[in-house]
Amino acid sequence: MFQLICKDGHARRGAFTTPHGTVQTPVFMNVGTQGAIKGAVSAHDLKEIGCQVELSNTYHLHLRPGDDVVRQMGGLHKFMHWDGPILTDSGGFQVFSLAGLRKIREEGVTFASHLDGRRIFMGPEESMRIQSNLGSDIAMAFDECVENPAPYKYAKDSCERTLRWLERCKAEHDKLNSLPDTVNPGQMLFGINQGATFEDLRIWHMKEIAKIDCDGYAVGGLAVGEPTQVMYDIIDAVEPYMPQDKPRYLMGVGTPSNIIEGVARGVDFFDCVMPARNARHGKLFTWSGSINLKNEKYKLDEQPIDEQCDCPTCRNFSRAYLRHLFKAEEILALRLAVMHNLYFYNKLTQRIRDALDAGEFEAFREAYSGKLSERA
């Protein structure tokens, strides 16, 4: 259930109740692809850095260790020892990124495992069964994420097929939730808007999927190489047709500025691998812009990564020490850097929520939307 607390223009402050707790929105979901954050960050650490929702990957967990294994271990929450909300994506993005290794038909997709090459079939029903076995709180509908750029005719055929797949997902999801031995009978389902970069397709598709009673709606297939302004234009185009009483999720986005601008356009949920991935390469976010800790100028720098940050890394270690760890290729460098960047993203959405509560979101947007895209 989604409760809209207040609005500032199109920006929304809300609360979304799940079987494993209430999520305060806007929210950034921390990406643990295989049930863990890359960089030796545990579920216990996620609590310390302010994570509300963990996101895991259906495709990867289906291949390894197998969703049947996770089910026998009591579901993903028990398996990874995380008692907060979990969202699982449908596996569609990963399957469709295997361009030369998959074949699409109405029933679903046949693809070759990136691990051992074995042929695997996944369709709407299979995706729902896997996610039911994982026991996540939010399951994502199985969709096709088309390549960018995509021909209009193919994008149209694809989003029509994705609509039919959503209907099948909904039927299978309802059936699975009613079974007596299901891992998480309160699991919710989000539908996904597609249509490439064609606004007319996006609007048509959003209107159609909104007729199917999902628990939330996502905008997918963006941040795949299109100009940032095109992404914003698509969000602006579909937002009027997204149900007001359901959460909105912008998939795979993005930079701190993208998140601020997404909130300004009515988005509630975000996820991205960027903070953890950048951290593993020494690229860290601060309230003054981003820095690259591997640069020579930090060799004798006694400051924390960010004077304004109170994450465990900034409370205890200097830029000079962290630079040394990176240069020495110590695993601790990855852990400390990832924890900082994820803390920063979680703090960013907390500060956005605080600004919305205070009626000061536009001032926050003006102060930080451009600044956070710059180098410090």
Give each language-model segment a name.
Residues M1-T17, V23-G32, G39-A40, D143-P149, ...:
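C-terminal extensions of enzymes
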Residues M1-V183, E296-K299:
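Non-catalytic, usually N-terminal nucleic-acid engagement modules in DNA/RNA processing proteins
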Residues G21, E54, D89, Q131, ...:
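Conserved, mostly hydrophobic/aromatic
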Residues G21, T162-C169, I209, V238, ...:
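Hydrophobic alpha-helical packing residues
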Residues G135, L166, K170-H173, N177, ...:
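Structural signal for hydrophobic packing residues in well-ordered secondary-structure cores
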Residues N148-P151, K156, G216-L222, I331-L334:
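Glycine- and acidic
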Residues E160-L163, E172, L176, N184-I305:
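Glycine-rich phosphate/ribose-binding loops and adjacent secondary-structure elements
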